[in-house]
Amino acid sequence: MCASPSTAPGFFNPRPQSGAELSAFDIGLSRSMGLGVPPHSAWHEPPASLGGHLHAASAGPGTTTGSVATGGGGTTPSSVASQQSAVIKQDLSCPSLNQAGSGHHPGIKEDLSSSLPSANGGSAGGHHSGSGSGSGSGVNPGHGSDMLPLIKGHGQDMLTSIKGQPTGCGSTTPSSQANSSHSQSSNSGSQIDSKQNIECVVCGDKSSGKHYGQFTCEGCKSFFKRSVRRNLTYSCRGSRNCPIDQHHRNQCQYCRLKKCLKMGMRREAVQRGRVPPTQPGLAGMHGQYQIANGDPMGIAGFNGHSYLSSYISLLLRAEPYPTSRYGQCMQPNNIMGIDNICELAARLLFSAVEWAKNIPFFPELQVTDQVALLRLVWSELFVLNASQCSMPLHVAPLLAAAGLHASPMAADRVVAFMDHIRIFQEQVEKLKALHVDSAEYSCLKAIVLFTTDACGLSDVTHIESLQEKSQCALEEYCRTQYPNQPTRFGKLLLRLPSLRTVSSQVIEQLFFVRLVGKTPIETLIRDMLLSGNSFSWPYLPSM
């Protein structure tokens, strides 16, 4: 056990009361007063009882203690005086140990002199730099803890200053701080340089980071997010191959969004936020489509989602004539004749083509894409229209319309035709069993029309986005209009793949051979698209 500083021999305690503290101002001298050098006789060896704390005092002159060398000078009164001044100065100003001492109580000169020789004999005039060589390199950190118990009785302020002395009142030395800051600045600089060297994959501007799966600038990031969140659809005034770079990226929004998707920016990475209540309708983006006042059938309760409801409204208004007008061609409770069946079939096909020409976004596609889409899906649209108007499908009139009664044929061919008629009837009846309303039929036809399975499409990405828009509209409509049928949307979508089981050749043979003979339906579809309103069939009276 070490001797307590207050009871050690030769130690003068000016305040023997318990818990008393002594600060630099309690000494009673002016701060600017000089420190006198004591006579040589004042310096003596420390008592043996304190040897555990003052082991450095036994070192002879010129001894190097710790990592700091004395330069061979030993312990001198002048060096100790400098250390005394540094210790007392610590109480007033912690960060510096370089200044000269000021003021010392003459009554404790001998007591401090018995403890201070344990410090290194060199000058205390500098910070410990960690070099371990040269005079004046600072107080040895290894002996600051040895001096700590002896100075404790003189006040808590001096204790704090002595604790901070070995490291210069900090956790690191100036040299280590400099090295650390230099390494950090170099690392951060290399990171900044690496970011600055990455270009936006869309326009080539400086990238601000990875957004939605790719490195892009802030402009392209905001443009892509805005386009996806609002389901915006653009049109190109050129050949849909506009240059997208830093100087031309704002000239064509269609080609810019197309390049964003082409370079790998993901739609699903954009978080769906709230659509602003003042969002412009579809009529603002496509002036040729005007929404009349009032909601069509099935849209009245769809007010919470104005954008999707407007889209469905446009799909419904694109019908060339109301569904109720189909009833004029049918005779209730009676089997339709051959002429009535052919007339109704012609109207259904013509209605599908005219509807496609008037719905949003389809006329903006290239003519080659329009023809390719309708050639592929015309039979599916025909089945949907047949189900929507509750077209009667009796076997005998269908066989008669196909001309199978007029010419003898093999039994296996008749059986095959009967199977195709049965498949056609099943698809129509399954759709009718779901009680699909007009808005749902319009969305289903849009989903069928905007397919990417057609060959030779020039803009697959844009067509796919239109199909996704139609699916979103149908899903939201089913959720709001049929809240008690959570599986309705899924059931409707599952009916679409089955529509392709109905052979287009069979439909053509059953309904159109009497009208066009051997002319392919695909040729008629192209003529209807290119002729505008001048196209007419013999079974298309004015409605």
Swiss-Prot record:
Source organism of the structure: Drosophila melanogaster (Fruit fly)
Main location: nucleus
Keyword Coiled coil tagged: no
Region ranges (Disordered): 38-191
Biased composition range(s): Polar residues: 83-101, 158-170
Subcellular location: Nucleus
Alphabetized InterPro entries for the sequence: NHR-like_dom_sf, Nucl_hrmn_rcpt_lig-bd, Nuclear_hormone_rcpt_NR2, Nuclear_hrmn_rcpt, Znf_hrmn_rcpt, Znf_NHR/GATA
CDD domains, alphabetized: NR_DBD_COUP_TF, NR_LBD_COUP-TF
The protein's name in its UniProt record: Steroid receptor seven-up, isoforms B/C
